Design a protein with these regions (language model features):
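Positively charged, small/polar-rich N-terminal and surface patches that mediate targeting and assembly
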Residues: 1-34, 38-102
């Protein structure tokens, strides 16, 4: 299972919705893959980030950090070759990352 497949599986485990993957090789100098996922509340967004980080560590994937824990309307988890954006619906609609990377 690739890292992208692993991440999507773990986000699905905690009922993440509207999960999309973008191959951003050649478009981004910091990563190869971007995954965006929606959570219904700050609690769910935090839980998905916590679970993803814990499961990645268990599986031997290195985590390079996270941002956004303070507000939990948008948490970014850096897995090196894959960056994961876990967002509440309002934040996702406001920032429209899909338009940026599609």
């Amino acid at each position: 299972m690739s890292l992208v497949e692993f991440v999507i599986d773990k986000l699905n485990d905690l009922k993440g919705t509207e999960i999309v993957h973008f191959d951003v090789k050649g478009k981004s100098s910091i990563t190869e893959n971007m995954i965006i996922c929606t959570g219904t509340s700050s609690r769910q967004v935090s839980a998905m980030a916590d679970n993803l980080i814990a499961e990645c560590k268990k599986a031997g994937y290195e985590t390079f950090g996270e941002e956004g824990r303070n507000t939990a309307d948008w948490i970014v988890v850096d897995l090196g070759q894959t960056i994961v954006h876990i967002m509440q619906r309002d934040a996702r609609e406001m920032y429209q990352l899909e338009k940026l990377w599609a």
